[in-house]
Amino acid sequence: MTPATTTTTQSIASAFALSAASQALCDAFADAATQAPWQSYICNACGYIYHEADGDPDGGLPPGTRLADIPDDWACPLCGVTKADFSPYEAPTLEALRAQASAAPPAYIRPRDEPGVVIVGAGRAGWQLAETLRQHSATLPITLVTACAGDRYDKPLLSVAMARQLDPQALVSETGRDAAHRLGVTLLAHTHAVRICADTRQLRTTRGVLRYGHLVLAHGAQAALPPGLHASLCWRVNHLDAYQRLRQHLGDQPKDVLIIGAGLIGSELANDLALGGHRITLLDTAAEPLARWHDQQAGPQLLDAWKDLSIRFEGGLQVEQVERVGSRYRVTTTSGQRFAADEVVVAAGLLPPQRLAQSARLDWAQGIAVDAGTLQTSVPRIHALGDCISINGQCSRYIEPIARQARTLAAAILGQPAAPYEHRAAVVRVKTTSRPLTLH
């Protein structure tokens, strides 16, 4: 072969290679252009939002899993329903909500001097009610009062975040400021509600007095502190700020963590802190974890799943004292047993704060007593929903009922046809990733 022939052959080969590379690049751009954007879907039962881009790694769905590709037996991480109960979702803008409210039959005409609705609490319940009200009224003044920043996040995912060592801000789906702007509501963040003056329809706060036409208490429940324990010596992880501080204290090195209480929250925390590399001691007065669901063998199933994790469960023990010894803590039980730990977490149930309810002389029964169908308290124009309420003396501190409660209250506040709330037993999904459980 002559040099000229060799050069020609090389040129042709180079041209073919360049053409192939160009075609591959064009194909890649075409694929990117034609690929459908990631979608979001909302659980019709509890309001959990599934983002295809994020997936549900703890439920076995890697990022990028389309809804159509999700197995039929997959369950909502919060309430346990299947993907059939999910609908397409796009966070509505204020303009869209106004258009929706304007298109609806007029059900509420606000008097000129009507001060509107004041909601105490900007957790799931408070924001759910604000959004439901705005869907039906574009003009109703809505004010949310919250002691925190008011950022929106799914509280049940706090324990899961421990195992994945997520930054707290990664849990925030929408900042309080952005949510307030989108819904056209007034958010008083880092503001404490101090007292209710029911006779004058006023709420006293650390930022002044607010008049209300309707007042809604949605301030949730706090992690209970057993007698004899001091809050300064124990963690209670029931909101984003507490999670952030605990994560900072735990740092990057494995720690000895003692958890008091092996119910739903305590068991999930134990599971996920252990998966995060920490050594866990879990104490409870009952003989097994999740004792409330003893008839469903929940405890034995968990203990079996934990065999390969650094979780030591000790049942039948009542904690008497927690004290600081040097840089660590010593936990003593009523039977005299002692345990040492780097950090102590209390997960011994939830207790709604009573101060506001007492100031308005609201009926109380393990929570703010409300009517089973209307969620009205014992005082006119004061309502409640979420973790802070009790119905016929029974509490239901789960996510699923909140959307239905919000619809009931919105109808009552706006003078629409009644939408009675139906109280029913919740299906509980235990987010212990070692062995997820669905309990009834």
Which residues does each PLM region occupy?
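Mid-to-C-terminal Rossmann-like scaffold of FAD/NAD(P)H-dependent oxidoreductases
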Residues: 111-118, 388-440
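Short hydrophobic core segments
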Residues: 120, 210-222, 339-349, 406
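Rossmann-like dinucleotide-binding cores of NAD(P)H-dependent redox enzymes
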Residues: 150, 156-159, 171-172, 256, ...
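A Rossmann-like FAD-binding core segment of flavoenzymes
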Residues: 33, 139, 182, 186-205, ...
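Glycine-rich dinucleotide-binding loop and its adjacent helix/turn
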Residues: 99-106, 217-276, 371-372
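Beta1-alpha1 glycine-rich phosphate/pyrophosphate-binding loop at the start
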Residues: 40-59, 109-185, 271-294
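FAD-site-proximal beta/loop scaffold in flavoenzymes
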Residues: 232-253, 330, 338-411
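Short linker/helix segments within small regulatory modules
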Residues: 58-73
